[in-house]
């Protein structure tokens, strides 16, 4: 697992209050990890802060799974 993937999974687990083992690549924030729309906004903000990037709203809406987040961060850092 890459350093980015590990850090993303740690942030997801912390922000959504789930076990890191649940943050598998294909897990959907809303369907599998129980996030609501506010949780996903806070998650995006935490990712922006951790990786020092800005995620535009139109991109944030496309980040729906753990792998989506990992891919986005990898492409934009």
From Swiss-Prot:
Belongs to the acyl carrier protein (ACP) family. The modification O-(pantetheine 4'-phosphoryl)serine is found at residue 37. One of its GO terms (cellular component) is cytosol. InterPro entries: ACP, ACP-like_sf, PKS_PP-bd, PP-bd_ACP, Ppantetheine_attach_site. One of its GO terms (biological process) is lipid A biosynthetic process. The keyword Lipid metabolism applies. It is found in: Cytoplasm. This is Acyl carrier protein. The keyword Cytoplasm applies. Pathway: Lipid metabolism; fatty acid biosynthesis. One of its GO terms (molecular function) is phosphopantetheine binding. SMART domains: PKS_PP (SM00823). Residues 2-77 form the Carrier domain. The gene is acpP.
